[in-house]
Each structure stands twice: as C-alpha cells, then as structure tokens.
Amino acid sequence: MDIFSEILPLREQIKTWKREGKRIAFVPTMGNLHEGHLTLIRTAREHADIVVASIFVNPMQFNNVDDLTNYPRTMDEDVEKLTSENVDLVFTPTPEIMYPEGLEKQTTVDVPVISTILEGASRPGHFKGVSTVVNKLFNIVQPDVACFGEKDFQQLALIRQMVIDMALDVEIVGVPTVREMDGLAMSSRNNLLTLNERQRAPVLARTMRWISSQMRGGRNDYLSLIEDASDQLRAADLQPDEIFIRDARTLQEPTEETTQAVILMAAFLGQVRLIDNLVVELSATSSDEEE
C-alpha cells in the first residue's frame, strides 16, 4: 500500500493507473477508523479496480477549536486497518499541504441552501468546509466513484448537489449506516464517551425508531412528536440538540405528497455530540423498526 502526504507524487500514481485503464474509487475520511469506515472501503472495492483513501482532519469544517483539538487521531492504527483491507493508496496530507495560504485565503466551495439549513443553521461554515475539502480532494485524486456514509445524511445530500452543480465526473455512492449491536451508529466520536455515557448512548437510536413507528402508524403532528422524543432523550440524560423531520428528497418540511421522510437527530451526551438519521417510508404499515 502506497502512502503519500504530498500531492504531486499521488497525482503521478493516479495518472499511471488512469493510463492503464483502471477505475478508481475514493473514500475520504478524517481517520480514527472503525467498522463503518471499513464498510465504505469494501463498498469502494466493489465499484472499482483501485481503492484510494484519505486521512485528513479538516480544520475548515470545525466550528469549535476544542472539538478540532480533541478529535481522535490514530494514524498508525488507521494505516494498519487500511492495509488489512488491501487499500491501494492512502493520502495523508497536513493542513499546510491542503491550505498552503491558510484558511483565510483559501478559495471555498459553497453549496447554497442545503449548507445553511438544518444542521448547517446551527453550525455556520461547517458545510462550506466539507464541500471545499471534498471538492479539493476530488480534484487531487480524480476518482471515478466516491463512497460516503448515509449516517451523515445532509452531508451526503450536499456532496451530491455539489457534484451536479460543478459538473464533476464522479459517481457518488451512499453506504448504509453501520451500527453497534445495541443500535448505536458507529462514529469516531463514540471513543470519547465514558463507560456510563456509552451505556446510555443507544437511547438516541431507540428514540429515533420510536418516532419512525409513530409516523408509520399515521401520526403527523410533527412538532408534538419532536417534543415527546426530546423528553425521552432528557429522561436518559441526553441533551437534545436537533431533531428534524423532513422530506428525504428535498430536506424541506414534509407535505401531503411526501412518501419518504427522514428523521435527523443530534444530541449531546456529556461533551460528545451524537448524530443519527433514519429514512421512513410513510406509506409503509409494518412496524419492524419498533423495539
């Protein structure tokens, strides 16, 4: 497995593969890899001859300096995991490589509307940081296909819109959320939870499934439903941050025409912000998501 931290040698290798007619898949990560990331890698392998991954903790997408400082960095372990998955190349740039003139002078990519609603409203600039770094990584790696987790539902929608708007020649593949045995969505931030917090963390997913069962049962008083869900979170000492019920296609308020909705949730458990989402088929009558 090749490991490059500089752009030029990576580009030379990419050019070689392109000349050989190889199809290239790309999985961008911020490291601290878990089974969810490895599922992205395996999915990428199904779509291409060559798999490239990146490990870069992107300072542009952090609103909180402490959050950036405390983000887990486990480069050696990450490289071992990627090696075991037979990744062909890993790109490990520093902030100085990605933003040589500093963040203030960096050209940015801003996807309107979708970057400022929902989570974007409470984290101004976050999605601009995401779209900028992903666009730059696409320009560097030149992938034919890129894989992203559906756990970050709004981020995936943002990237898909950016690819359309910028006419980027890359296929975007969404990969279903990977969960722990107790239902908690896998996340690098889970490592920051104390033992007690980790035991309470699955309440987020359970509450989300409860909302889903209520919706599929015909309940559509969404504001009241969100309040009830917030109470469930607080009862388990989780602090609700955001709970949205939106049309899964538009991310706008559901209408009578909405057949597929998405529940978007975020809550603080101690100092850790957990996120999750669940798509709900409003025409469905089964209750297989219930506890």
UniProtKB/Swiss-Prot annotation:
<keyword id="KW-0436">Ligase</keyword>
<feature type="binding site">
    <location>
        <begin position="149"/>
        <end position="152"/>
    </location>
    <ligand>
        <name>ATP</name>
    </ligand>
</feature>
<keyword id="KW-0963">Cytoplasm</keyword>
<feature type="binding site">
    <location>
        <begin position="30"/>
        <end position="37"/>
    </location>
    <ligand>
        <name>ATP</name>
    </ligand>
</feature>
<feature type="binding site">
    <location>
        <position position="61"/>
    </location>
    <ligand>
        <name>(R)-pantoate</name>
    </ligand>
</feature>
<dbReference type="InterPro" id="IPR004821">
    <property type="entry name" value="Cyt_trans-like"/>
</dbReference>
<dbReference type="GO" id="GO:0015940">
    <property type="term" value="P:pantothenate biosynthetic process"/>
</dbReference>
<feature type="binding site">
    <location>
        <position position="61"/>
    </location>
    <ligand>
        <name>beta-alanine</name>
    </ligand>
</feature>
<keyword id="KW-0547">Nucleotide-binding</keyword>
<keyword id="KW-0067">ATP-binding</keyword>
<dbReference type="GO" id="GO:0005524">
    <property type="term" value="F:ATP binding"/>
</dbReference>
<keyword id="KW-0566">Pantothenate biosynthesis</keyword>
<dbReference type="Pfam" id="PF02569">
    <property type="entry name" value="Pantoate_ligase"/>
</dbReference>
<feature type="active site" description="Proton donor">
    <location>
        <position position="37"/>
    </location>
</feature>
<dbReference type="InterPro" id="IPR042176">
    <property type="entry name" value="Pantoate_ligase_C"/>
</dbReference>
<dbReference type="GO" id="GO:0004592">
    <property type="term" value="F:pantoate-beta-alanine ligase activity"/>
</dbReference>
<dbReference type="GO" id="GO:0005829">
    <property type="term" value="C:cytosol"/>
</dbReference>
<comment type="function">
    <text>Catalyzes the condensation of pantoate with beta-alanine in an ATP-dependent reaction via a pantoyl-adenylate intermediate.</text>
</comment>
<comment type="similarity">
    <text>Belongs to the pantothenate synthetase family.</text>
</comment>
<feature type="binding site">
    <location>
        <position position="178"/>
    </location>
    <ligand>
        <name>ATP</name>
    </ligand>
</feature>
<feature type="binding site">
    <location>
        <position position="155"/>
    </location>
    <ligand>
        <name>(R)-pantoate</name>
    </ligand>
</feature>
<dbReference type="InterPro" id="IPR014729">
    <property type="entry name" value="Rossmann-like_a/b/a_fold"/>
</dbReference>
<dbReference type="InterPro" id="IPR003721">
    <property type="entry name" value="Pantoate_ligase"/>
</dbReference>
<comment type="subunit">
    <text>Homodimer.</text>
</comment>
<protein>
    <recommendedName>
        <fullName>Pantothenate synthetase</fullName>
        <ecNumber>6.3.2.1</ecNumber>
    </recommendedName>
</protein>
<feature type="binding site">
    <location>
        <begin position="186"/>
        <end position="189"/>
    </location>
    <ligand>
        <name>ATP</name>
    </ligand>
</feature>
<comment type="pathway">
    <text>Cofactor biosynthesis; (R)-pantothenate biosynthesis; (R)-pantothenate from (R)-pantoate and beta-alanine: step 1/1.</text>
</comment>
